[in-house]
Amino acid sequence: MIRLTLAALLVATPAAAADMAFFVKNLRAQGVAVELFSRDSDKVWPGGNKVFFIRPKAQKSVPISCTPGERICWGAWVDGNDQISAGVGPDNDQPCDNCCFICTEHSTETIDLVQ
């Protein structure tokens, strides 16, 4: 009976979240806003209509919790002008070949925002 209970708990336990980070380097002369979007769910980081703001010529480490194996894409745009954007853009609707990463425990991915 105990084995059945343990087996049921193992099956019912959701996948543990992975903690990873994105190291964002803003090489632009303007401040930029950045959001991270899951391609496997409706999750957005930081969420709640907020953004990660990176000052001009600055860098920031952005820690997140995600589901291992989840595909995460970044979108960035000049603060105050979302017509100048990179990655998947502010609405997560732009094509992009190199702006997505796989959620992996204890990993750090680098995003370079250039002119």
Regions found by a protein language model. Give the residues of each.
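Sec-dependent signal peptide recognition
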Residues: 1-7
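N-terminal signal peptide c-region/cleavage motif recognized by signal peptidases
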Residues: 12-14
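Intrinsically disordered, low-complexity segments enriched in small/polar residues
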Residues: 17-66, 75-115
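Exposed beta-strand face motif in extracellular beta-rich ectodomains
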Residues: 70-72
